[in-house]
Amino acid sequence: MHGLLLAAGLLTLPLRALAHPGHQSTSILSRRGAVDLDAYRVSAKAEYSNVNDVAENPPAVSLMSSGSYVDIATELVKTTLPGVTFRVVNDHYVGTNGVAHVHFRQTIHGVDVDNADFNVNVKDGKVFSFGNGFYKGEIPKENPMVKRDFSDPVHALKGACNALKIPIKTNKVSVKSGKGQESVVFKGTSGALSEPKGDLVYFVKPDGKLSLTWRVETDVGDNWLSSYVDAKDSSKIHGVTDYVADATFQVYPWGLNDPTEGSRQTLTDPWERNASEFTWHSDGNTRYPTTRGNNGIAQDNPSGGTGYLNNYRPQSSALRFEYPYSTSMSPPTSYKDASITQLFYTANTFHDLTYLLGFTERAGNFEVNNNNQGGRGNDFVILNAQDGSGVNNANFATPPDGQPGRMRMYTWNRSQPNRDGCFEAGIVIHEYAHGLSNRLCGGPANSRCLSALESGGMGEGWGDFLATAIRLKANDTRRTSYTMGEWASNQRGGIRQYPYSTSTTTNPLVYTTVNRYNRVHDIGTVWATMLYEVLWNLIDKHGKNDGPRPEFRNGVPTDGKYLTMKLVIDGMALMPCNPNFVQARDAIIDADEALTGGQNKCEIWAGFAKRQLGTGARYGRTNRVGSTEVPSECR
């Protein structure tokens, strides 16, 4: 195997321009000023019973120490909600921390309640924690499959396109039966990247009432929507989930902050074989002499179109991807080889790092060939460099496990010469983090569990946090602050209202600040600020590994930086669908209990409590209550 000599311009740009001018939703529809998708956000209704709740009120599960973890989880659901019908989602797995994750979907008359989920976490043959988001209201007596009391799915597609201004032409549409019950594929449309799909499902509306709907999936590039259209009145849209998440944050590459802080380096075989067993240039069946492999495929996309397999990418039979680049070069097409190479390097490095921290095949990561390690394959990340569909931004689409993710990186025109987002590792990391969190929260088969306002905010915050943690330098201390996006936006101070800092003078954000926010990126800044506090508490306790990969002892990272990242990632898999801050805090504390036996509980509590997410904190959509209290044993 030839060594890969990868000219990895560890150049980065902070993220100011990544935040949309003023504020814009993650949707291109909103940018057109046509539809505000935030008005259709799914409501968060799940309850989370953390490890302490389970210990204080043990569930009456007869299979506590016998049977498989799926049997134990199933028995818990049956005993918690007797008489409720449900199905096991086929995405259960055991995480690297030894906790098994099982997800359930409520059914009524054999029809899924699409936003009614129950997740159970099992450790050592016992229920560890669980989240309950099942519908608790009145069950319809009549089976809609018998009465056929619902509209034609074509009406639903046309209703969604009309109400949401989705640019798909439907005048020649027809339907073909899909794989499931009352599942269809829409034929004869134009304007979509793939054929729209429809499934008959129940949907719990924001008012708590149940409605029979058509879930209509439409991918038009900047938006990949799941729209819940009333099955009787196609003019009513009860909820919308967008698989696409825009970037508004920036973190820097491994080692360098941005092009002003260092030079590009030529790296040899930079992959981690424990995470990428086929290297970055093979899927186990084919060796690719280009920027393609098991984890991703990188190319330019100047037209902004949907195709990618036949797009340009650099070729090298010797796997020597060394191309010139400097910040003075212009136009961006003059250095597209370097741009594609940089994007391929950064995305693969993040894949390998998160794999070591628990985002494996079973957990729903992005790989073509899962090599019999569980999960669903055929889903590398499509990595589009210098994508012509936009400027001053980036986005990532996360469909369920088994379908490729899609990252689109744009050029930036806030400076002369223009800048290329691929050289800002933080942008790539933030985008890829959307794929990570959407696959882990709610399980790999459900990419709709960060669609509520507060959970969507945490989706943004996780990206900021991971980007910031990765950019820490050897001499940094808890007094070090970081902004986001200064280089990309060419604006001093970056794109966030405050820098990430443990100083409440520099950054005064606390839990109750969220009461004033109704945008996911603002909410995400509060969440990332809290995680930054936890990060430094654990670094002060365990030290900081400044290498590119963690070191482990008995499965636990030996330093505070990677330990925090591990707990945050493990916590994503524990929490319920569409969690709030309080539930996500509990899940991270539970993750520490599962991984270390709770050795870091007090440091974690102290970090959250400093920002008003202490033991007395209470969630409310507009009346969140803050608390600086910690458990008595931590005082």
UniProtKB/Swiss-Prot annotation:
UniProt source species: Uncinocarpus reesii (strain UAMH 1704)
Free-text cofactor note: Binds 1 zinc ion per subunit.
Higher taxonomy: Eukaryota, Fungi, Dikarya, Ascomycota, Pezizomycotina
GO cellular component, one term: extracellular region
Compartments where located: Secreted
Alphabetical UniProt keywords: Glycoprotein, Hydrolase, Metal-binding, Metalloprotease, Protease, Secreted, Signal, Zinc, Zymogen
Pro-sequence residue ranges: 20-246
Co-factor requirement: Zn(2+)
Function of the protein: Secreted metalloproteinase that allows assimilation of proteinaceous substrates.
Positions with a binding annotation for Zn(2+): H430, H434
Gene: MEP9
CDD domains: M36
Record-linked PANTHER family: EXTRACELLULAR METALLOPROTEINASE MEP
InterPro entries in the record: FTP_domain (IPR011096), Fungal_virulence_M36 (IPR050371), Peptidase_M36 (IPR001842), Peptidase_M4/M1_CTD_sf (IPR027268)
Chain intervals for the UniProt region annotation (Disordered): 279-307
GO molecular-function terms, A-Z: metalloendopeptidase activity; zinc ion binding
Glycan attachment points: N274, N413, N475
Signal peptide positions (record): 1-19
Top EC class, one word: hydrolase
Name under which the protein is recorded: Extracellular metalloproteinase 9
A Gene Ontology BP annotation from the UniProt entry: proteolysis
Family membership noted in the UniProt record: Belongs to the peptidase M36 family.
EC identifiers of the protein: 3.4.24.-
